[in-house]
UniProtKB/Swiss-Prot annotation:
This is F-box/kelch-repeat protein At4g14905. The lineage of its organism: Eukaryota, Viridiplantae, Streptophyta, Embryophyta, Tracheophyta. Residues 34-74 form the F-box domain. It comes from Arabidopsis thaliana. InterPro entries: F-box/kelch-repeat_ARATH, F-box_dom, Kelch-typ_b-propeller, Kelch_1. Kelch repeats lie at residues 137-183, 184-229, 232-280. Gene3D superfamilies: Kelch-type beta propeller (2.120.10.80).
Amino acid sequence: MSRSAASSVGSITGESPQKKLLQSASSSSSLAILHDEIAVSCFARVPRCYYPAISLVCRNFRRLMASPEIYIERSVIRRTENILYVAIRSEATKTLSWYTLNLKPFGTTEISHRLVPVPSFPSIPGYGTTIISSGSETYVIGGCIDGELVSTVSVIDCRSHTCRFLPNMKEPRKCAAVGLIDGKLYVVGGCNAPSLSWVEVFNFKKRTWESVLSLDNVDMDEQMNFFVMNDKIYRIGQNTMFVYDPKKGRFEEDLALGRLWFNESCPIDNVLYGFYCMNQILAYDLVVGMGTVFWGLEGLPEGLQSCTGRMVNHGGRLAILFKKSPTEIWRTEIAIERAEEGGYISGKFLWSNHVLTLTDSFIIERALAVTV
């Protein structure tokens, strides 16, 4: 349109050409926002395994797939998924790499699962770090860098793989027992004893660490594992198990569990599961105080053992990731069956399949379930 024609249009409508151009640009911007809102609403209903393929369609789709809005929408419409994150350390280079267990796009069976790398995952100290998950977030506590213990605490948002830091702990730590209980972050042990802050707690509202308990008159051996159940932190040593109850503010020794659990275990609905013997799993009901051995689950693969396997609660199922050979990782899932509360516990083998092959020997350091 020529300048004279635009002036004629402006004189007829009573509006300047510049104003009409601004209104047109504003309409286009509003339309783009509306299109984004519609796209986010649609994509939020699509399983995450298709997101990499959708991201390849165009730059705008790639931007939307990485936006926090799509995960907010997934939460609102209750389409979140329970995703497994696995930390794998190379025995040759000692580097830590992160993977997620995803379905192959257009896969139709359980064997379509695979571990895919997460190159954007923030770096984590090389040794002794405690890693836990809650909702869509992963907490990274302490560790050892260049032979020195650190007191740093970071929080990774697994929706965007971005990281923020909490204030440093009072004590540097490695291999600490950690639990999120009643909206507070408790950290137990892992520091040089004796310490006035052997147990400390982070108050998210005040954003401060407080010393809770010193280590007095308690003979604790080296920590091998820990878990949180019934708002208590269970610390597993080589020969002992101590339970820290934040409400009572003290430790109590659990003699029964101390004889059973030392390396790898996983709590699901007040029941603790762990490796018992080669290719056997023991379920221990903490409420009833009784254990059940899953003898010879049909289809259970050879090679399950605590020194190479990691257990995790995967949406109420028991997922086990383990080394089947020096370079292969397999995943097994077991459905937990129980007639009623306090009743007999049994396990049903669902499937086992190969999910990753690496070129070098490795250690499965950690397995976490994250909701996104």
